[in-house]
């Protein structure tokens, strides 16, 4: 004797109601064979819908066992139950349960998506089913554009999408007019004639008489289970004939043979590359569908989506802009430091800044400069000595800082010339009476427009010819107001100051040489020359590192403030997603009923949250570039610098925000009970 396809043994179903449990099904024993057409009849509250939910693996018994093709459903996990619903059951609901925001084809494709059917195959299958059920011209109509009878036919077509070995019809004619109801009953008869097992749940005995077997249920117990003596008459009434059956045959694609049982899940295909490839393709298809449905959901609620993204937009704009401002400021500061001489080491007499004995130390001499310049790690070395002296040109007298320097001083300091040229080594050797002045000195002595090159000025009563004028330097540290004059250090020592020692020596380290190692080497050399350490060094590299570290700290601080905005935006995403889950509870139930796994639902809502954040992140980055363009218009000195790393970080942050703040709503959605979800309005 062939085992029944569906079998309930001593099944009891209880639901908690306050401090007590309400028994909805009590010790139900029922067997349904493959290929039967059965009607379960009962009044409202009799337990017939709960029985159908258990038969369709949407619910589970509190006690007893339910087997499908010999497989005990109690031993199956949620994914295996979803597989049963997806591959062997088809549901026809009284309220149709179609997704309102997609067309008929998309509603039909849903079970096939979760079954991993390729897009082209499932699309062709959906259009074929609609054509067989007389809805070819309604394929791209949404449910709201269809009549009740048409919606129910779409529901039947969806039940057949994956084969539909067992069709569970819950009050299939309850919301239809008489003509549409007869059409639905006729279709169910045709499907049964092709080998589908049909279970009709109804309170209407006129509908029940279309089944070969009628099962009556009352107060959770089966009170009658008898064959229907009027089945032949009912069969003839709806006009089901051989022609109709043949016409529908191609539609169902040979439903499983009446004796076939659902095959057990196969977990031993991991080593076989073909199933692995199919699983990968199916997973990719489900992910693509999740992205498509997420986009449809976002577009369907444009204003809410925009408001949800607003926090992410502000957060990403803040993060990217602050990083760009910080990077631009750092580069500008380093350029400014470079203008006063980067990769340089200066030597001063004494032990440190403010040493009271520094004025009495006279050991820094021109010979030290020559010795340092010969070192392999040194690019150039220049001496420096300075005094404040009186300058005179015609009837104009001013005080200026007069510095005696070497010919490489201007290169070492990164100074540029507006007029004329610097003095050379020959001028230093000859103690030439030549001078280079800055723009402040030019304006004081000659005015802003007159060319001073070739003019003679008195420097503390020593005549000097102006041979060059340095260019103005706009500095982040403020513009320099002092007057500066540079003469050869030999001229300063022999003709102006009357001193043979130097105030300082500046060494420029060769490119590629480590500044710290060079500093140690020159200290060692100078100690050997002087016999003791009567000097200290000042390495500009330490200033650069300090500026970089300060810039990084400031950028980090401001970025943390911006991240707070991003977190607030993420909380907004989570709130809206929780609302979305509540609003779309029935959709979740529909997806679970047609075979969606918990992971599919989790993926659906997680993708939606990530998509919101990615869109917000993209808009935020675009706004940052717009702010950068405006910034360059109003701030001429320096620009915001956008790096690829900052942009990638922004996308990563927006994605992580979607994952982190979208996970809880998505998890809540995946954990919904299918029955509770379907019952929500």
Curated annotation (Swiss-Prot):
Highest taxon of the lineage: Bacteria
Protein localization: Cell inner membrane
Stated name of the protein: Macrolide export ATP-binding/permease protein MacB
Keyword Iron part of the UniProt annotation: no
Sequence ranges assigned to domain ABC transporter in this UniProt record: 6-244
Matches recorded under InterPro entries: AAA+_ATPase (IPR003593), ABC3_permease_C (IPR003838), ABC_transporter-like_ATP-bd (IPR003439), ABC_transporter-like_CS (IPR017871), MacB-like_ATP-bd (IPR017911), MacB_PCD (IPR025857), Macrolide_Exporter_MacB (IPR050250), P-loop_NTPase (IPR027417)
CDD domains for the chain: ABC_MJ0796_LolCDE_FtsE (cd03255)
Cited function: Non-canonical ABC transporter that contains transmembrane domains (TMD), which form a pore in the inner membrane, and an ATP-binding domain (NBD), which is responsible for energy generation. Confers resistance against macrolides.
Membrane topology category: Multi-pass membrane protein
UniProt binding sites for ATP: 42-49
Catalytic EC class: translocase
A GO term, aspect molecular function: ATP hydrolysis activity
């Amino acid at each position: 004797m062939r085992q029944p396809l569906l079998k309930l043994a001593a099944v009891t179903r209880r639901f908690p109601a306050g401090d007590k449990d309400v028994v909805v099904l009590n010790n139900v024993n029922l067997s349904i064979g493959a290929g039967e057409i059965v009607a379960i009849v009962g009044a409202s509250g009799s337990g017939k819908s709960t029985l159908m939910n258990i038969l369709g693996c949407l619910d589970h018994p509190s006690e007893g066992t339910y087997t499908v093709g010999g497989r005990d459903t109690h031993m199956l996990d949620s994914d295996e139950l979803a597989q049963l619903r997806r591959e062997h059951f088809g549901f026809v609901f009284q309220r149709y349960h179609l997704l309102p925001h997609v067309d008929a084809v998309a509603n039909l494709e849903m079970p096939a998506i979760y079954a991993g059917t390729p897009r082209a195959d499932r699309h062709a299958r959906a259009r074929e089913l609609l054509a067989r059920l007389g809805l070819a011209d309604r394929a791209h109509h949404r449910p709201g554009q269809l009549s009740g009878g048409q919606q129910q036919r779409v529901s039947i077509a969806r039940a057949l999408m994956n084969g539909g070995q067992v069709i569970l019809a819950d009050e299939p004619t309850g919301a239809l007019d008489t003509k549409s109801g007869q059409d639905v009953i006729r279709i169910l008869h045709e499907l049964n004639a092709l080998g589908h097992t049909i279970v009709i749940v109804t309170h209407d005995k006129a509908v029940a008489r279309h089944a070969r077997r009628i099962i009556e249920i009352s107060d959770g117990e089966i009170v009658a289970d008898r064959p229907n003596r009027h089945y032949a008459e009912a069969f003839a009434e709806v006009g089901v004939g051989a022609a109709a059956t043949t016409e529908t045959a191609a539609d169902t694609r040979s439903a499983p043979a009446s004796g076939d049982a659902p095959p057990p899940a196969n977990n031993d295909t991991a080593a076989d590359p073909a199933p692995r490839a199919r699983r990968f393709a199916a997973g990719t298809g489900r992910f693509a569908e999740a992205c498509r449905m997420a986009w449809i959901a976002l577009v369907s609620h444009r204003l809410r989506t925009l408001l949800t993204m607003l926090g992410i937009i502000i957060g990403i704009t803040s993060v990217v802009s602050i990083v760009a401002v910080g990077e631009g400021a750092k580069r500008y500061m380093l350029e400014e430091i470079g203008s006063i001489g980067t990769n340089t080491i200066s030597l001063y007499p004494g032990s440190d800044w403010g040493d009271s004995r520094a004025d009495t130390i006279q050991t820094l001499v021109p010979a030290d400069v020559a010795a340092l310049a010969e070192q392999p790690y040194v690019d150039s070395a220049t001496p420096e000595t300075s005094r404040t002296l009186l300058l005179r040109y015609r009837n104009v007298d001013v005080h200026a800082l007069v510095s005696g320097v070497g010919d490489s001083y201007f290169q070492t300091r990164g100074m540029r010339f507006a007029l004329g040229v610097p003095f050379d080594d020959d001028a230093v050797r000859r103690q030439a009476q030549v001078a280079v002045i800055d723009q402040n000195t030019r304006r004081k002595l000659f005015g802003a427009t007159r060319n001073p090159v070739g003019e003679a000025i008195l420097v503390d009563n020593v005549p000097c010819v102006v041979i060059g004028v340095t260019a103005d330097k706009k500095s982040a540290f403020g513009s320099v107001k002092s007057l500066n004059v540079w003469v050869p250090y030999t001229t300063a020592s022999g003709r102006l100051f009357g001193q043979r020692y130097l105030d300082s020596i500046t060494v420029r380290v060769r490119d590629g040489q480590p500044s710290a190692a060079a500093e140690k080497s020159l200290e060692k050399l100078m100690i050997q020359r002087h016999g003791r350490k009567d000097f200290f060094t000042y390495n500009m590299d330490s200033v650069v590192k300090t500026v970089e570290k300060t810039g990084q700290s400031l950028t980090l601080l401001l970025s943390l403030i911006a991240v707070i905005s991003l977190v607030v935006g993420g909380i907004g995403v989570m709130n809206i997603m929780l609302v979305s889950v509540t609003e779309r509870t029935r959709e979740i139930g529909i997806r679970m009923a047609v075979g969606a796994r918990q992971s599919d639902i989790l993926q659906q809502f997680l993708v939606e949250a990530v998509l919101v954040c990615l869109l917000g992140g993209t808009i935020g980055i675009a706004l940052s570039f717009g702010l950068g363009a405006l910034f360059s218009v109003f701030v001429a000195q320096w620009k915001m610098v956008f790096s690829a790393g900052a942009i990638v970080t922004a996308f990563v942050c927006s994605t992580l925000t979607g994952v982190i703040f979208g996970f809880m709503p998505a998890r809540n959605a995946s954990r919904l009970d299918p029955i509770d979800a379907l019952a929500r309005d």
